[in-house]
Amino acid sequence: MKQEGSARRRGADKAKPPPGGGEQEPPPPPAPQDVEMKEEAAAGGGSTGETAGKTAAAAAEHSQRELDTVTLEDIKEHVKQLEKAVSGKEPRFVLRALRMLPSTSRRLNHYVLYKAVHGFFTSNNATRDFLLPFLEEPMDTEADLQFRPRTGKAASAPLLPEVEAYLQLLMVIFLMNSKRYKEAQKISDDLMQKISTQNRRALDLVAAKCYYYHARVYEFLDKLDVVRSFLHARLRTATLRHDTDGQATLLNLLLRNYLHYSLYDQAEKLVSKSVFPEQANNNEWARYLYYTGRIKAIQLEYSEARRTMTNALRKAPQHTAVGFKQTVHKLLIVVELLLGEIPDRLQFRQPSLKRSLMPYFLLTQAVRTGNLAKFNQVLDQFGEKFQADGTYTLIIRLRHNVIKTGVRMISLSYSRISLADIAQKLQLDSPEDAEFIVAKAIRDGVIEASINHEKGYVQSKEMIDIYSTREPQLAFHQRISFCLDIHNMSVKAMRFPPKSYNKDLESAEERREREQQDLEFAKEMAEDDDDSFP
């Protein structure tokens, strides 16, 4: 047994590799099945990625087709609203269709418009052939929607002018959003020719929208002066026809046209010679008030400019039109500074206004402290932005306000100060300039002081009690007027029932007479009841 155990150990020692670096047998090669399986797995992974990509693309295409289908159905519904407005002579149905125009215009594409033009322009081949070259013909597949809104007798009937104008307006908006302004101009010119030959009250609301986008296309092409005579002609026609929406839109377009070329005198004449319709919607009112505010500000009527621009902000939409509110706030801040008032800091902290009003916040700080050096620094840094905003001319006028504020701050800080020190603090060229500015501030009532010309210093007078002046009374008057204006505008904005609603209702005197007769009749009945008993 011992011999067998030692033999086994010797056999095991021989089977072990030598410890000293002897050659080892190479490991067996991997099974070919494993290699094939890995290759198949890699190939399977690649095909899975391609399949996932194709699936995602197919899903995106399917969702886009569904969105296009919904858009076409919306356009079909809007056309029904227009037809209902024409047949029932109810303009509110037109308003309902136009109210959805911004939402519809964002979903327009070549496929939707191609299907809409083919589906609606069934009897008018000339207009269809004119519009289709501006669109790319889509690749038809079996899954494409067969859009046929007009079938049978309706397909051969002529399209209503309101519907035709609406569909062409969609084309203009799509081309304008695609920055194809030349092509949009051709369609818009053709649309204006068709509208000019029509005299239909149901078309007035659609035409007002067409006027706006027509002028917008020419503005993008920098040809606003070309379209001015056309807008004047349409304004005369709209006024004669008592078209309030057309009047409001065309007046605002003409004012925008004049202000674009800085023709403030012509704009002022247009405002004075025309009457803005009271029945116009709030958006047109907000635009009109902003344009008149710009005119008043240029003509040094700052109080009136502030009033109109405050009303413009009040008329503007609360949660949208952020760009419009930013533009109005920029001009309003400059006007308030020119009036010698400091805007509320909360204006600059609103999230939608904070970034755009940052240069004006720095400008306000410079004016508030009377720091002429900081004012010049802000002007140099943001001069191009102020010019783009159209406020640079007004901001240049603020230099005198900055100097006046600096003089007032110096007067409050020192009871007596030399003219040379004032010139140094205000960064003026000489003490003579400081003497002139201080004398003008005394004459305007900015400070209460006297100048000693011989010794060259300014002596401030004792401060008077502000409550003994008319300033508190004027401040209260301004606030009360503001509250009364809000009340009056709120009452005007309310909707009241028509006067015909009260025709069948009795007056107060008739009601009193009826109640008196009822009382007498009740007494007679009571006496009859008493007489019936023995």
From Swiss-Prot:
The keyword Glycoprotein does not apply. The modification Phosphoserine is found at residues 418, 430. Pfam families: PCI, Rpn3_C. One of its GO terms (cellular component) is proteasome regulatory particle, lid subcomplex. There is a cross-link at residue 38 (Glycyl lysine isopeptide (Lys-Gly) (interchain with G-Cter in SUMO2)). Residues 286-465 form the PCI domain. GO terms for biological process: regulation of protein catabolic process; ubiquitin-dependent protein catabolic process. GO terms for molecular function: enzyme regulator activity. Belongs to the proteasome subunit S3 family. This is 26S proteasome non-ATPase regulatory subunit 3.
